[in-house]
Amino acid sequence: MMSKLGVLLTICLLLFPLTAVPLDGDQPADRPAERMQDDISSENHPMFDAIRGCCMPLSCMLLCEPCCG
């Protein structure tokens, strides 16, 4: 009985391998560079001043880059 089950499992894996399953292209794991860029962007920091193009002087201590001093 176990050998028949093993043969059936082997045939199923040969006919439909697990790598043939299509992956969702919208997964963030598929694009790690974009995900990292979005996470560390200083423009998205709440202390970033878009008009001046830099962070407020006190936010340098809060790891907001670039600082204008």
Curated annotation (Swiss-Prot):
It is found in: Secreted. The modification Cysteine amide is found at C68. Pfam families: Conotoxin (PF02950). Keywords: Amidation, Disulfide bond, Ion channel impairing toxin, Neurotoxin, Secreted, Signal, Toxin, Voltage-gated sodium channel impairing toxin. Residues 1-20 form the signal peptide. GO terms for molecular function: ion channel inhibitor activity; sodium channel regulator activity; toxin activity. The keyword Nucleus does not apply. Expressed by the venom duct. The keyword rRNA-binding does not apply. GO terms for cellular component: extracellular region. It comes from the Eukaryota. Residues 21-52 form a propeptide. Is not hydroxylated. Its main location: secreted. Mu-conotoxins block voltage-gated sodium channels (Nav). Belongs to the conotoxin M family. The cysteine framework is III (CC-C-C-CC). Classified in the M-2 branch, since 2 residues stand between the fourth and the fifth cysteine residues. This is Mu-conotoxin-like Am3.3. It comes from Conus amadis (Amadis cone). The lineage of its organism: Eukaryota, Metazoa, Spiralia, Lophotrochozoa, Mollusca.
